[in-house]
Amino acid sequence: QDEVGLGSCSVIFVVGNEEGEAKDGYAVGGDRCRVRCSPLGKNKDCETACRKKAGSYYGYCYLWFCYCENVSESAVVWGNPTLGPCLSDG
């Protein structure tokens, strides 16, 4: 029986980074919300979302949202101040 234990949770988002430093973050859909996913961990849907929406070649499902590593410099990821509010939040 598989169980997912989350001892502590933290919200990770990108506001800015040093020049040359790799940028990571949650993929954002057309509604400006994070892209939801399941199952956790390695996830083909997240790999696709990260490639198409963040210019990243590595993504996985973390806390039920697609998280992308080493995204392109021009990519807008969740938490970016220029993004605006998620349109599905009411």
UniProtKB/Swiss-Prot annotation:
It holds the Pfam family Toxin_3. Residues 23-87 form the LCN-type CS-alpha/beta domain. Its main location: secreted. SMART domains: Knot1. Expressed by the venom gland. Residues 1-22 form the signal peptide. It is found in: Secreted. Disulfide bonds join 33-86, 37-61, 46-66, 50-68. One of its GO terms (molecular function) is toxin activity. Keywords: Disulfide bond, Ion channel impairing toxin, Neurotoxin, Secreted, Signal, Toxin, Voltage-gated sodium channel impairing toxin. GO terms for cellular component: extracellular region. InterPro entries: LCN-type_CS_alpha_beta_dom, Scorpion_toxin-like, Scorpion_toxin-like_sf, Scorpion_toxinL/defensin. GO terms for biological process: defense response. CDD domains: neurotoxins_LC_scorpion. Has the structural arrangement of an alpha-helix connected to antiparallel beta-sheets by disulfide bonds (CS-alpha/beta). Belongs to the long (4 C-C) scorpion toxin superfamily. Sodium channel inhibitor family. Putative sodium channel toxin. This is Putative sodium channel toxin Ts35. It comes from Tityus serrulatus. The lineage of its organism: Eukaryota, Metazoa, Ecdysozoa, Arthropoda, Chelicerata.
